[in-house]
Amino acid sequence: MNNQRKKTGNPSFNMLKRARNRVSTGSQLAKRFSKGLLSGQGPMKLVMAFVAFLRFLAIPPTAGILKRWGSFKKNGAINVLRGFRKEISNMLNIMNRRRRSVTMILMLLPTALAFHLTTRGGEPTLIVSKQERGKSLLFKTSAGVNMCTLIAMDLGELCEDTMTYKCPRMTEAEPDDVDCWCNATDTWVTYGTCSQTGEHRRDKRSVALDPHVGLGLETRTETWMSSEGAWKQIQKVETWALRHPGFTVIGLFLAHAIGTSITQKGIIFILLMLVTPSMAMRCVGIGNRDFVEGLSGATWVDVVLEHGSCVTTMAKNKPTLDIELLKTEVTNPAVLRKLCIEAKISNTTTDSRCPTQGEATLVEEQDTNFVCRRTFVDRGWGNGCGLFGKGSLITCAKFKCVTKLEGKIVQYENLKYSVIVTVHTGDQHQVGNETTEHGTIATITPQAPTSEIQLTDYGALTLDCSPRTGLDFNRVVLLTMKKKSWLVHKQWFLDLPLPWTSGASTSQETWNRQDLLVTFKTAHAKKQEVVVLGSQEGAMHTALTGATEIQTSGTTTIFAGHLKCRLKMDKLTLKGVSYVMCTGSFKLEKEVAETQHGTVLVQVKYEGTDAPCKIPFSSQDEKGVTQNGRLITANPIVIDKEKPVNIEAEPPFGESYIVVGAGEKALKLSWFKKGSSIGKMFEATARGARRMAILGDTAWDFGSIGGVFTSVGKLIHQIFGTAYGVLFSGVSWTMKIGIGILLTWLGLNSRSTSLSMTCIAVGMVTLYLGVMVQADSGCVINWKGKELKCGS
C-alpha cells in the first residue's frame, strides 16, 4: 500500500493574507483620484479648477461635475473665481514683462504677419481679413514688437465698405468699451464689413415723407394710386360685353377650352375681357365726352380739349367730328433739383481724443463726398486714456448716390400738342378700332399755333389754337423716378427730406444733407458704426398718392393739361347731301347698344338696291309723332349695301321708338332711356361749373374790355347754358329776350331787396343767354330771320 501523499495541482490559498494591501500603488492612487474628480468629489477649489480646465479644452463636463457645480454656494464660488482671475492677471503681467529672444520672435513673425501692414499719417495701419478675428497680430515697430488683439464683431469680407479706427495702447488695465488694443503703440486698423456675398449693411428704416394728398391738380386725368382707372376699365368691360355679346361668348368658350379648373377658367375669361375693350370707337369708348352743337350757318366753334376727354362737334350741313387731345409733349425740360433715394457708404473712418487733448480731426471732413458727425464719448484707463472724462470723437463715411430722381421745370415754348380729328362716317371698321388709323393728327406748337388738316371727302378743317395748358408751371414740377413720372407741387418737392443736389450738369455731383439717408450708430470709445438706409422708392410711391401720373416714352414726357382751339369749318363739306333718301328696308345687324353718354349705337345693313342714298332716321312715340331726339352721326349714308353702317343717336328720355327707314318698310326699334330732362339739366349745370373750376386761368382773358365780357359770358354759358336750353327749348328768340327784360324790370321795381336782386340776376342771365352765346359755341348773324344763331 502506497502511503505517500499526492502533490496538489495549485498552491493552496493562504488565509492569513486574504486582506487587501493597506498601502496603494501610484497607479492605483491616480486612478482613484481621477475617478473621484470626474464624479464631482473633492475640495471646492480643486473641482472648480478642474471645471475651468475642462472649459479651456472645450471638453464637456460629466453629470457628476455638473451636479457638484450646482451645489456650490454663490458667495464661495465667486470668491474662488476672483482668486483665479487674480492669478491669471499676475501670469499675464509676468509674460508681458518677459523679454522674448530674437529667435523666438523670428519664429512667430511669419505666422503673425498674415495681415497687410501700411501707414496712415506716419502711424502703422493694419489691414486685416475675417480670419484674423481673436488672433494676436505681431509686427515690428521702432518701440519693439507690437502685439495687437482684434475682437470686432462686425469684421467681414474685404470690400469698399471698410471700417477704420485706432487701437489704443494698453499694458496693465483691462479693456473697456474697445474691441481692439495693442501693447506697444497706438495702431490704426482697417477691415471690411461686407458679407460673403458682397452685400453691404443696410438699415431697413424709411424716411418719413409727407404724402402729396390734397396738392394734386384738378384735371380729368386720374391720379397715382387711385381707384379711378380700375373703375373705368370695369365700365369699359361692361359696355363692350353688352355691345358685343358674340365676342363675349367666344371668350367664354376659349376660357373653357384652355382652362383645366374652374378657377383657371375664370381667371382666363377675366383677362380676356380686360383686354378686349381696347377695340372701341374713338369718342364712344371715352367716358369724359362733351357735345358741342352749332346751328345752321355756323362757321367756327370754340372748344377746350383736355387729356382723357373727347369733344364731339355737330352743326347742320357739316360733318360730325370727334376731336381729342392725344398728348402734350415737352422736350429737354430743365432739371431743377435731383434727389437721392438710394445710396451706399464706404471708407468709414473714426478718430478720437482723450479728455483735455482737444478736438478729434480727420482729413475726410474737408471732402464734400464724405458725411461726418461729431460727438463725445466716455474715456478712461480701459481705453487708452490716463484721465477719466468725455473725449472728442469724429466719424466720417464716403457717400455715393446709387438711385436718384429728378425734378424738372417745364417751359411753355417747349410744348407740342397732338390733336386727332375723326369724322363720324359710320364705317364699321372705325367703330371697331381705337387707333389713329381712321383719324387725322394735327400738331400744335407755340411757334405754329394754326394748323389746317385735310379730311378725306369732307374738305379741310382749320385749327387755330392758343397753346396754353392751363397749368401754372411756376407751381408744378415734373418728377421723374426711373421710368415713371408725376406732376407734383413744387413746394412739396423742395420740402422732401432727402439728399439733394442742383440740376446743373457737372462731372462730380455734390450732395447736400447726406445725413438724411445715413444712420450713425451708438458711439464707442474708439469706434462708431455707420449704416445707410435702404432704397426709398417704396416710400416715394406711397407719398405720391394723389399726384397726377404721367406717361413717358424716351425723352418726351406726356402729361395732363388743356388746349383751347377754334375750329374753322367754313371749308368743310358734308358728304352725301345730294343723295336721295333710301326707299328700301334695313336689317338690324347687332342689338342696339347704349353708350355711357346717354347715346345709342345702331348697326344696320341696307337691303335695297338704290345705294348710295341717305338713311332716314328719327325718334317717335307710340302714336308715331316725331320726338325731340338728336342725331349724332351727321347725314348717315349708305355707300355699299354689303357693308353695315353704324349710326349714333341720342333718343329722348323715357319710352320711344328708333325708326330707321321710311314708310312701311321702316325698321322700328323700341327703346327706353333712363333719367329725366330736369336731372340732366342739373347734372350738366354742375359739370359746367366744374369745368370752369378746372380750366382756371385759361377760361379768363382780361387783355381788353372785350376780353372781360368774353370771359364773363363764357362763365355764364358754361354753368347755365344747359339749364337755359332745357327750360326755353321751345321758345322763340324774341320771347327769350322778352322774358329776360320782364324779369329785369320786375327786379328794378321790387321793394324787397332779396327778390329784387334775384329777379335782376335771373333776368340778366336769361337776357344774356338769349342774345349772346359764348364758350364752346359757333355764331353767325341771320339778318333775314333776325336771329343770332349760335351753337350751345
Curated annotation (Swiss-Prot):
GO terms for molecular function: protein dimerization activity; structural molecule activity. Residues 1-101, 261, 747-752 are cytoplasmic. It comes from Dengue virus type 1 (strain Thailand/AHF 82-80/1980) (DENV-1). InterPro entries: Env_glycoprot_M_flavivir (IPR000069), Env_glycoprot_M_sf_flavivir (IPR038302), Flav_gly_cen_dom_subdom1 (IPR013755), Flavi_capsidC (IPR001122), Flavi_capsidC_sf (IPR037172), Flavi_E_Ig-like (IPR027287), Flavi_E_Stem/Anchor_dom (IPR026470), Flavi_E_Stem/Anchor_dom_sf (IPR038345). Residues 120-242, 281-725, 776-792 are extracellular. Residues 37-72 are annotated as: Hydrophobic. Residues 101-114 form a propeptide. GO terms for cellular component: extracellular region; host cell endoplasmic reticulum membrane; host cell nucleus; host cell perinuclear region of cytoplasm; membrane; viral envelope; viral nucleocapsid; virion membrane. Residues 1-15 are annotated as: Interaction with host EXOC1. The transmembrane domains of the small envelope protein M and envelope protein E contain an endoplasmic reticulum retention signal. GO terms for biological process: clathrin-dependent endocytosis of virus by host cell; fusion of virus membrane with host endosome membrane; symbiont-mediated suppression of host innate immune response; virion attachment to host cell. Keywords: Capsid protein, Clathrin-mediated endocytosis of virus by host, Cleavage on pair of basic residues, Disulfide bond, Fusion of virus membrane with host endosomal membrane, Fusion of virus membrane with host membrane, Glycoprotein, Host cytoplasm, Host endoplasmic reticulum, Host membrane, Host nucleus, Host-virus interaction, Inhibition of host innate immune response by virus, Membrane, Secreted, Suppressor of RNA silencing, Transmembrane, Transmembrane helix, Viral attachment to host cell, Viral envelope protein, Viral immunoevasion, Viral nucleoprotein, Viral penetration into host cytoplasm, Virion, Virus endocytosis by host, Virus entry into host cell, Zinc. This is Genome polyprotein. Glycans are attached at N183, N347, N433. The record marks R100, S101, A114, F115, R205, S206, A280, M281, A775, D776 as: Cleavage. The chain crosses the membrane at residues 102-119, 243-260, 262-280, 726-746, 753-775. Residues 378-391 are annotated as: Fusion peptide. NCBIfam families: flavi_E_stem (TIGR04240). Disulfide bonds join C283-C310, C340-C401, C354-C385, C372-C396, C465-C565, C582-C613, C779-C790.
